[in-house]
């Protein structure tokens, strides 16, 4: 496993995400943007999986989501890996955010590479939906379009899906999501019910987005791009093939005490 911080990887993560302690045969600790570190990452690996990407870090998505993944792909090709599985994002080619442009650029490069390419596009993650539960704790959830649909997936279910695809060894691209499809209104009410609050859902007018994103970009282009990515997904259906056995309502119930 290639990580920046082994100690962090061996601790339980947010929302009870599991530690990797005792599960990794060999650690590679370093900076994936450094060519000397990346060139031999895939040495001895029969298959490569990359979920590498910018989340809340201050790094440039183009450097990480595209170029660093290309360096890992080059290592996989150099050392003869049989397949390369990439965790992308559903709808990335249509989303205007810099983050998704970087992901799309790498996904296209992977498809052209001389390796069995497997591109997995999750709709959203349960962990992403904790922001809705935090709003629900305050008694009201604010959304844009109540009819837009999504089916978030638990990270463990996504991992099972990826392992199944690796075992099959087929080349392709798959849009995946969890077993439950929600409208945003239904998701908001699920969060409010988990927090034992009255079903108070407010609608944010979409006309506010251009000036709000423009104002945010004056102070932080990174935050503006993250907001552009998040709001785009809230305004477009993000529904993948139903996968897994874990349900968001149960996840909310298990983690309500952590918000």
Residue ranges and their predicted role:
Residues 7-71, 75-78:
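NAD(P)H-binding glycine-rich loop region in Rossmannoid oxidoreductase-like domains
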Residues 45, 69, 103, 132, ...:
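A general structural signal for well-ordered alpha-helical segments in protein cores
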Residues 2-4, 51, 87, 120:
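The conserved SAM/SAH-binding core of class I Rossmann-like methyltransferase domains
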């Amino acid at each position: 496993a290639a990580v920046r911080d082994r100690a962090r990887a061996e601790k339980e993560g947010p929302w009870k995400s599991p530690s990797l302690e005792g599960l990794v045969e060999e650690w590679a600790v370093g900076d994936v943007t450094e060519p000397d570190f990346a060139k031999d990452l895939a040495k001895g690996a029969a298959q490569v999986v990359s979920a590498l990407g910018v989340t809340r870090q201050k790094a440039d998505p183009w450097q990480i989501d595209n170029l660093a993944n290309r360096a890992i792909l080059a290592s996989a090709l150099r050392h003869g890996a049989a397949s390369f599985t990439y965790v992308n994002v559903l709808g990335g080619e249509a989303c205007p955010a810099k983050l998704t442009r970087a992901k799309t650029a790498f996904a296209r490069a992977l498809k052209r590479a001389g390796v069995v390419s497997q591109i997995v596009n999750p709709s959203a993650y349960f962990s992403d939906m904790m922001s809705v539960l935090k709003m629900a704790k305050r008694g009201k959830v604010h959304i844009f379009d109540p009819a837009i649909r999504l089916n978030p997936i638990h990270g463990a279910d996504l991992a099972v899906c990826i392992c199944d695809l690796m075992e099959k060894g087929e080349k392709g691209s798959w849009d995946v999501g969890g077993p439950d499809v929600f409208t945003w209104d239904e998701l908001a009410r699920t969060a409010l019910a988990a927090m034992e609050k009255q079903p108070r859902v407010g609608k944010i007018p979409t006309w506010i987005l251009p000036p709000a994103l423009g104002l945010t970009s004056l102070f932080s282009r990174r935050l503006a791009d993250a907001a552009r990515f998040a709001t785009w997904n809230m305004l477009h259906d993000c529904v993948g093939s139903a996968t897994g056995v874990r349900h968001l309502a149960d996840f909310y119930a298990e983690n309500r005490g952590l918000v």
